[in-house]
Amino acid sequence: MRRMIWIAAVAAVAVAAGLAGCGSREGADMDGIAEDIEARLAAYAETEIAANLDVLPASEREALDRMVEAAEAMHDAFVRQALPMADEIRAALDEASGPRTDSARAYFEINAGPWDRRFHHEPFFGDWEHPEGANFYPLDLSEAELASLEAGENGTNGLYSMIRRDASGALTAVPYSEFFADEYARAIAAMETAADATANESLRAFLTARIEAFRTDEFFASDMLWMDLDGLIEVVLGPIETYEDGLFGYKAAFEAFVCVADPEESARLAKFKGELPWLEANLPIPDEDKNPNRGSDSPIRVVDVAFTAGDTRTGIQTIAFNLPNDEKVREAKGSKKVLLRNIMNAKFEQILTPIAETLLVADQLGSLTAESFFLHTLWHEMSHGLGPGRIVKDGRDTEVRLELKDIYSSIEEAKADAMGPWCIFKLQEKGYFPDSIREQQAVTYLAGLFRSVRFGIAEAHGQANAIQFNYLLDKGVIEVEEGRFRIDVEAFPLAIEGLVHEILVLQADGNYGAGMAMIERYGGMSDVLAAALESLEGVTVDILPRYAVAD
């Protein structure tokens, strides 16, 4: 069953292969570079991203600069995770020549390899097949070894290890602290200098604990301290998300965010975190499936990004995150929602607004608002902290992530996306928002579906948005009028609650089969969706950030 999702995705991508002139390998030149490489590269708009560093005292500016250095080490570690056969591939790219070579090299940097992340990792340079497990696992796994890995035998399903062969040829888990010793040494040296420089006690405590985590592969203590950061600098450094492991979803990929916080805007949103227990109690699932044990601290931070690296810097740029992922931390302290304001603003202006003007019916365009985009992003991240996390399946304690394996990321992103407006509508009933939020949220949400599905349905967020679009189209909530789209504002709240219910139930049950069935039914590139995306040929797919702090 695990392989079926990839077969379906390949077929679906083929339907959408002509989008923006991209996605077809026909006619590669003699150096193996896709003929449409310039169009693929042009889909990403170079955008300068800057944070106001003038608000930082000298001590914190020094700390931030050193954390940028640590972030660069995380990027190098991530590329090692993402790129198998690195020496062979890089040598071939270095030797390539021709009019499209520079574009291929630039696109290689965007994708951390020769595979296009928008189009199910199809090669845009050479003909190497992308391994589902990236470089986390050996490339020559037997069926018996795959079964052993899937079962997590001998600790091979740990988040913080690379799977390699020992001298006898047997599979062994190599801890990140050993495998990435060089990158860790660079990051630790930079974090030590940052910890000495900062005047903020919470940042110093976190960095000190993070250094120890890098040395021991034990991240719980530093994740707990990360929840308490209260200064002007917000930072994420280390192995975090598991999207890159497309084989099992076990392995954490390296990434980094170095940001400057806005305390006043963060305080404005703090009122919402007190509603999380009430929202959990009102989720549309049986009480026994709810998770009242997740912590409710859940700080909200509004920040401007100064620098990113690793997993988050590759391909599509994120606009917010909700961390940590460790369910033990979530039960003790909740999770932190971090909104990347300058990234969000750039995407609203350059991408979401042109998409809406191209695809939505004219009489609903006035309901597209930056505030609704911001609120949906906030409640998407809040929703990651709601619903089943640690569950009991067949009498054993486990986690939703472990039971859903390779499809977890797509299902979880669909849950958070759909639950975002559900939460907003519930809070509107309590008086937090005016009645107008219903149409504004529905219209902005619809435009957002088109924005995110353009990332490609092989990517978790893109596939999650395909699920939502096709589900709502099937329910008659999304209507097509002469090539443009309308959302039924009155029917939307009930339909979105139905989708939230279906996802939460399969998560509570740890039901891989039900999750796969949802993806197979709704997660493909339907004809209606493919035609809509084709009409967006002239609209930027995503930004390509150029960080001022790096200049």
What are these regions (language model features)?
Residues 29-206:
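N-terminal helix-rich structural modules
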Residues 176-365, 369:
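Contiguous, non-catalytic segments that form substrate-binding/exosite surfaces or channel walls
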Residues 504-551:
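Extended, compositionally biased alpha-helical segments that mediate assembly or anchoring
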